[in-house]
From Swiss-Prot:
Keywords: Acetylation, Cell membrane, Cell projection, Cell shape, Cytoplasm, Cytoskeleton, Membrane, Phosphoprotein, S-nitrosylation. One of its GO terms (cellular component) is microvillus. Residues 42-92 are annotated as: Interaction with SCYL3. The keyword Membrane applies. It holds the Pfam family FERM_C. The [IL]-x-C-x-x-[DE] motif is a proposed target motif for cysteine S-nitrosylation mediated by the iNOS-S100A8/A9 transnitrosylase complex. Its main location: membrane. One of its GO terms (biological process) is regulation of cell shape. This is Ezrin. It comes from Mesocricetus auratus (Golden hamster).
Length: 92
């Protein structure tokens, strides 16, 4: 699976890779040129709550990796009206 988001204008991906062995997985997170990998055997827990994806490693001294997936808020009425006016002007 691939979770996609844009952070400060650059795409960021969270990907779950399946290796040759059906029980081996690897999680990769990368942003532009930076890539972070998590072997499945080193992950204690994975949780997802609304906008936050958390990977907890087996080593309790290691920090948790938190991946935020912002949700797009619906346009306000004013913005919707401006878009409608712009669309009407373009179609004339």
């Amino acid at each position: 699976q691939l979770f996609d988001q844009v952070v400060k204008g650059f795409p960021t991906w969270l990907k779950l890779d399946k290796k040759e062995n059906p029980v081996q997985f690897k999680i990769q997170v990368w942003h532009a040129e930076h890539r972070i990998g998590f072997p499945w055997s080193e992950i204690r827990n994975i949780s997802f709550n609304d906008k936050k994806f958390v990977i907890k490693p087996i080593d309790k001294k290691a920090p948790d990796f938190v991946f935020y997936a912002p949700r797009r808020k619906p346009d306000t009425i004013e913005v919707q009206q401006m878009k409608l006016q712009d669309f009407e002007q373009k179609t004339k």
